[in-house]
Amino acid sequence: MPKPRKKENKGLPARWQIDHGAYYYHVPPGLEAAWDGKKKFKLGKNLPEAYRVWSDRISATEAASTVAQLLDRYALEVIPTKKPTTRAGNVLALKKLRSVFGALPLSAITPRHVYMFVDQRRKKKTDETGKVTGGLTVAHREVEVLSHAYTKAVEWGYINNHPFKNEVRLEGEKARTRYVEDWEIIECLALESKHKKGSVHAIHAYVRLKLMTGMARSDLLRLTVANLKDDGIHIQRHKTAGSTGKRTIYEWTPELNAAVEAAKQARPVLSPFLFCNRKGEGYIDEETGNCHGWDSMWGRFMDRVLKETEVKERFTEHDLRAKCASDAETLEHARALLSHADARTTEAIYRRKPERVKPLK
């Protein structure tokens, strides 16, 4: 949970702070280029001056003529509105986009430039530290950011038309096909716990809930007792809360009720969260969107599964969500379970069983 703001900072814009009588702005990581390379930018000694400097800093981007200037404004005004994990990925994308396209005039970008960029970025490379960079998925994400920045450029009046929207056809990413078999689930659930609570017990309950509901990890790990109503589990998908606002009620069954009770019993301490750490806190850091504690626990669980059971191929939590969709009798049921607004997403990504057809007589 983020720390509460100090009394003297309440009422100020986000990331503003009073320090030794002056007003400062804490620059989001990765956006330092738009603030003279500083992490903590001094706005002024009094509030009117601070707002004037802030206004000048924002308006300085209004005459953007290069890609770098466009990306600077995008970093200041658009990226901060996104979810933490998306924001972090966008910041990394901007760094690469600036280095490649930054000096170009806004009107100079053509579809050919985008294709050349993707062709170079799709090749994974290892730097001197051993870190792997690039790849097709990374290239696509970076182009998505550049494309959205140009969409904003049209909105802001910098240009009249998007230079490559509907003109670039990128090669699709290979869909994941891993289907977790029933016997593999049985093997995982048979894994014995070394502790009375938490750890394996929690993951067993998590797996059962995931397979019955198909909930995304971000929703499942945010479940609290407040979501448990008389008629079922009520959720609003975290991912689409600000867009479609999709709400779902998973109606109670004896099996679902048993899985929820198992999750409660597995908690190391009493907590509002259905899944919590030893401090009773939820696993998701709302400020960053990360859940490193849960990731570590899941990783250790899968290591034991591969070592102590007959399962030979690792699977992810996302694969369990796909299994739920694949095992549903109809596409519509799968779509409803996964809280998708469009069944095409469910069909293309999550329905992984081969289609059975009868031959003609």
Give the label of every model feature segment:
Residues T253-V311:
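Active-site/catalytic core of tyrosine-dependent DNA strand-transfer enzymes
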Residues I109, H201-I203, E310-E329:
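Short basic/aromatic active-site micro-motif
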Residues K42, L76-T151, E155-Y158, K174-T177, ...:
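N-terminal core-binding DNA-recognition domain of tyrosine site-specific recombinases/integrases
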